[in-house]
């Protein structure tokens, strides 16, 4: 089974027009594991998919790891939760991260509850599981 490391973003906390926020993907066979989710993570995964890395098709993004809770490493988290769901991810996102990851996740889901309700019950019905997140906090 072949393993690849794909750099999805190598930016810093500074707004740089030529670099997306910190994010990588470890691709093992046909599975992708996202590591950190800086701004642009889903767009960059989509670009990698269109350049031949099938495992980075956005609706297949189902497992992610967060190294730490700095904003430059997490600002793309709502995008990682919701965009693949809108694109019909059928299962919850599994996220492994430090203490505080569950708290952050709960607040993101709360902030977007109106959108979630609209997408589940509105005109273009989305599935009821793809926006959910299963968090495992890892003690450091």
Task: Map each language-model feature to its residues.
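Binuclear metal-dependent hydrolase catalytic cores
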Residues: 1-140
């Amino acid at each position: 089974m072949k393993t690849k490391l794909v750099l999805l973003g190598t930016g810093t906390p500074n707004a740089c027009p030529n670099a997306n926020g910190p994010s990588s993907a470890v691709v093992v066979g046909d599975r992708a594991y996202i590591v950190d989710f800086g701004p642009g993570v889903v767009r960059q995964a989509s670009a990698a998919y269109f350049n031949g890395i099938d495992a980075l098709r956005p609706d297949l993004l189902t497992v992610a790891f967060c190294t730490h809770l700095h904003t430059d490493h997490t600002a793309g988290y709502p995008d990682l939760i919701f965009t693949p769901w809108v694109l019909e991810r059928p299962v919850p996102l599994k996220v492994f991260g430090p203490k505080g990851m569950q708290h952050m996740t709960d607040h993101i889901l709360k902030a977007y509850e109106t959108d979630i309700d609209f997408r589940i019950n509105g005109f273009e019905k989305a599935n009821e599981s793809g926006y959910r997140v299963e968090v495992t906090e890892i003690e450091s």
